[in-house]
Amino acid sequence: MSWQAYVDDHLMCEIEGNHLSAAAIIGHDGSVWAQSATFPQLKPEEVTGILNDFNEPGSLAPTGLYLGGTKYMVIQGEPGAVIRGKKGPGGVTVKKSTLALLIGIYDEPMTPGQCNMIVERLGDYLVEQGL
């Protein structure tokens, strides 16, 4: 399965009538493996900041999580595995796999729990596959 198919079929899938507003799979080096058409252009320092938070959990909390220049307030995640952010009625879930970052961005009416489920389910699968 291509990385784009993982984004299209698994991250941008429908859950209880809702969809993520944007999603991507990004390599640890910052290269985009696949993304939805609506995913923002990430800056290298944004990817570095995310990876640093996985290595040193809590490092993004004071400054916020930035994606394409949009700031998200960091909320409780799973140290070293999942970073969650909130901005108004929407937010973001970032799951780290062995080789990549899976990023899902949502807005209402999708709930944070639905976003977490979609992103983390695929992330867990990729980890199991050694990816």
Curated annotation (Swiss-Prot):
CDD domains referenced in this protein's UniProt entry, alphabetically: PROF (cd00148)
Highest taxon of the lineage: Eukaryota
Primary subcellular site in the record, as a coarse category: cytoplasm
Any one cellular-component term (Gene Ontology): cytoskeleton
InterPro entries tied to this protein: PFN, PFN_euk, PFN_sf, Profilin_CS
Pfam families associated with the record: Profilin
UniProt keywords, alphabetically: Actin-binding, Allergen, Cytoplasm, Cytoskeleton
Compartments it resides in: Cytoplasm, Cytoskeleton
Matches recorded under PROSITE patterns: PROFILIN
GO molecular function: actin binding
Subunit structure: Occurs in many kinds of cells as a complex with monomeric actin in a 1:1 ratio.
Family label: Belongs to the profilin family.
Cited function: Binds to actin and affects the structure of the cytoskeleton. At high concentrations, profilin prevents the polymerization of actin, whereas it enhances it at low concentrations. By binding to PIP2, it inhibits the formation of IP3 and DG.
Official protein name in the record: Profilin
Organism: Prunus persica
